């Protein structure tokens, strides 16, 4: 199941080289992650209300081209792997058809401040599509 988020590149997101500063790619994937969770029928506020707190364990970024001020970026999010206590999501950031960056983020299910297995219904939704 793919979720999509899109936004114009803002001037404030660019550095002196005229390209998007690297940290903003993680901001965009964080925005896209909300849509990804929601697409799986797991809105963030519902997870939190149940005491489920997905925490970022790791993110890796691999750039292939730059996004610049005035571009519109699109982030596609897709489930890459579901573990007992974790899920890895691949975010592809692009301008038009040009891939700018691929980000892989692993979230760990936490409950009460410690890692916990995904509840069965959550795991089932994460593995759909």
Region roles according to the model:
Residues 1-5, 63, 67-72, 79-129:
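HotDog/MaoC-like acyl-thioester-processing domains
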Residues 58-62:
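Short alpha-helix capping/helix-loop boundary micro-motifs
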Residues 1-56, 111-129:
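Hot-dog-fold acyl-thioester-processing enzymes
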């Amino acid at each position: 199941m793919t979720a999509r988020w899109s936004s114009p590149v803002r001037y404030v997101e660019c550095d002196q080289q005229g390209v998007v500063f690297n940290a903003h790619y993680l901001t965009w994937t964080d925005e896209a992650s909300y849509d990804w969770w929601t697409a799986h029928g797991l809105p963030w506020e519902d997870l939190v209300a149940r005491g489920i707190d997905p925490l970022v364990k790791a993110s890796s970024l691999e750039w292939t081209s730059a996004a610049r001020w005035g571009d519109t970026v699109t982030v596609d999010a897709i489930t890459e792997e579901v573990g007992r206590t974790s899920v890895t999501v691949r975010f592809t950031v692009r301008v038009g058809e040009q891939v700018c960056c691929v980000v892989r983020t692993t979230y760990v299910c936490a409950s009460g401040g410690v890692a916990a297995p995904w509840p069965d219904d959550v795991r089932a939704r994460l593995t759909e599509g």
